């Protein structure tokens, strides 16, 4: 309860005050309709002239070929962030028809959903966060996509599966930690897109990629964020 939380905070303050001089103030935050605030601040995102990401309360975009409806809740992937935009734009230059796809760190599921709309027929999305997993399942249903299997887990969940295309919009540390697992899940013609890192991270990721038999297709950036598109050498 709020009362128990307040009492717990007071106990902590009292304990710390025994060790050093400490002053504190308490402010009650006015209750607000956070859903309304979120809706007021969530604007549709155009990835290019072929794709738009919107929320359920936006009007439909009948003039756009690929419309993706996302209810993000606590998950990452609305298209507003540079990394999501970078990966999605790059996806339009890849042939997805009848391909198998892995979306690592799937968040809202937006990348996997776009891959399905671009023609991929066998898709797996994996995220360690339970909120994200549940949200991705919900978003796939909203978009009438039934070809994606979402998994609550990490790279170990890949198992012995092999994919034509891997999307990993995560962060530098996880990419470096799990890249060997990703490469193991690639065939001789597979492609992989990494994002979620900065310019200074590129040498580390490229070095590890080349050690594992990958070669760079293209490197792109948006503001300070980077994207690497690689394939089997």
Mark where each language-model region is.
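S-adenosylmethionine
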Residues: 128-232
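Conserved beta-strand elements of the Class I
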Residues: 68-69, 102
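Conserved beta-strand segments that form the floor/walls of ligand-binding pockets within enzyme
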Residues: 52, 69-71, 86, 193
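Conserved SAM/SAH cofactor-binding pocket of Class I
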Residues: 74, 78-159
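N-terminal auxiliary segments of SAM/dcSAM-dependent transferases
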Residues: 1-62
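Conserved beta-strand segments of alpha/beta enzyme cores
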Residues: 23-25, 52, 122, 147-149, ...
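Short loop/helix-cap segments at secondary-structure boundaries that form the rim of catalytic
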Residues: 59-64, 158-161
């Amino acid at each position: 309860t709020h009362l128990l939380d307040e009492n717990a905070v007071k106990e902590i303050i009292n304990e710390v005050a025994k060790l050093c001089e400490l002053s504190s103030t308490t402010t009650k935050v006015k209750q607000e309709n956070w859903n309304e605030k979120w809706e007021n601040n969530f604007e549709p995102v155009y990835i290019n002239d072929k794709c738009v990401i919107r929320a359920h309360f936006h009007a439909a975009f009948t003039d756009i070929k690929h419309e993706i409806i996302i209810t993000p809740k606590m998950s990452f992937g609305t298209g507003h962030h540079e990394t999501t935009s970078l990966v999605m734009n790059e996806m339009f230059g890849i042939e997805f028809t009848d391909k198998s796809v892995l979306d690592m760190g799937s968040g809202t599921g937006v990348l996997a959903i776009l891959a399905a709309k671009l023609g991929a027929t066998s898709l797996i999305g994996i995220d360690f966060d339970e909120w994200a997993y549940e949200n991705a399942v919900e978003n796939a249903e909203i978009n009438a996509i039934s070809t994606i299997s979402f998994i609550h887990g990490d790279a170990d969940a890949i198992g012995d599966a092999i994919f034509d295309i891997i999307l990993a919009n995560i962060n530098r540390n996880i990419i470096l930690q799990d890249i060997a697992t990703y490469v193991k899940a690639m065939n001789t013609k597979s492609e992989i897109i990494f994002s979620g890192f900065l310019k200074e991270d590129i040498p580390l990721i490229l070095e590890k990629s080349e050690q594992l038999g990958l070669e760079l297709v293209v490197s792109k950036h948006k503001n300070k964020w980077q994207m690497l598109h690689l394939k089997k050498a």
